[in-house]
Amino acid sequence: MFSEKLLAGRNILVTGGGTGLGKSMAARFLELGADVHICGRRKSVCDETATELMDLHGGRVTSHGVDIRNALAVDEMVEAIFKDGPLTDLVNNAAGNFISRTEDLSSRGFDAVANIVMHGTFYVTHAVGRRWIANKLRGNVVSITVTWVRNGSPYVVPSAMSKSAVHAMTMSLAAEWGRYGIRLNTIAPGEIPTEGMSKRIKPGDEAGARTKAMNPMGRVGTMEELQNLAVFLISGGCDWINGETIAMDGGQALAMGGNFYQLRDWTDTDWEKARDQIKAQNEKDRSARQ
């Protein structure tokens, strides 16, 4: 689909690049000739991913153990990257989400999502963007959001609010920074199953089962489709796309709203079971970080 070295000479940072969607996009960028930086809280995971991707595709992947909720740590990482060679592109992928009745949410639960998705995404975008402007460099930012930035979603209110903030940031900075040759766009994918996220927002379901039943195309999305859209947006194939949120969900948002309204019929027992499964996944993730 793309020429073999389409991204040669590009230097791309992918947040949350050690696993899941971020890892997949990083792999495709590397395969197409880019130098890639990945960051995440678990440095060991990012190191393993960097080694794995370079073994598969060659090239250069640099890993950074950074919590993007920490603005100072983000700025130090970006400064170090720019000293080695300025970034050309940023992919804001790091995220967090879980389902909950909003009346059951704690402030800690809300902050766990908002601090990563809203604050963290801004911190990274700001640190990269102001260096592009100071050095008179063009750049591209692609952020991963959700289809419900347009219509909201019950039962994932921290994510709906935070992703909508990223959507607003994208439109606002596209207008403000466009004159510097800096473009910002977002991809709003439907369900592309990953282990951790699937167990937090669709606990108990077979991966993709609900989407397959409700989606006009009768299936979930694929990593390859996300990779291809991300590559297109940063490739320069159409530099006049700026400030857009592109849904990639098989038409589910159009047909069904693309959100979690269907959970209105859950009983207290259903919610208790979901909480237990989410807690188990969180414990598993904490153990992996130790």
Regions found by a protein language model. Name each.
Residues 125, 162, 170:
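Active-site helix of classical SDR
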